[in-house]
């Protein structure tokens, strides 16, 4: 379903979020949505497949007709090629010390 305020002539917000998530986590993302209206609710379609770089490798599909999209994905590339350069290694450079306690990595009483 479209996000409130979404311009129907622009790319679906969900697709932009998929691209950002794929890039930030160095993973391939396949996002599928149906098209048309069900129970009075519209669906935006525009399914897509995104590379670990954040760029689409298939799609977006049609916003108003059924369509199947395909892409080749070398899953080994997510590990082998995710380090852009020595100063930009997204997963290595995460600051888990900032949020690990909140996620339960360091259990201590009363943090919540």
Q: Which residues make up each language-model segment?
A:
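Cysteine/selenocysteine-centered motifs that mediate thiol-based redox chemistry or coordinate metal-sulfur cofactors
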Residues: 78-112
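Flexible domain-boundary/linker segments
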Residues: 35, 39, 64, 71, ...
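CN hydrolase (nitrilase-like) catalytic-core segments centered on the catalytic cysteine
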Residues: 1-67
């Amino acid at each position: 379903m479209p996000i409130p305020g979404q311009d129907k002539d622009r790319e679906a917000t969900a697709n932009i979020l998929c691209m950002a998530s794929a890039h930030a986590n160095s993973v391939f993302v396949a996002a599928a949505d149906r098209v048309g209206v069900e129970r009075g609710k519209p669906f935006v379609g525009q399914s897509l497949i995104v590379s670990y770089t954040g760029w689409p490798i298939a799609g977006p599909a049609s916003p108003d007709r059924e369509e199947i999209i395909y892409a080749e994905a070398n899953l080994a590339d997510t590990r082998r090629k995710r380090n852009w350069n020595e100063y930009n290694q997204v997963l290595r450079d995460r600051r888990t010390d900032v949020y690990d306690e909140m996620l339960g990595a360091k259990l201590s009483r009363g943090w919540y």
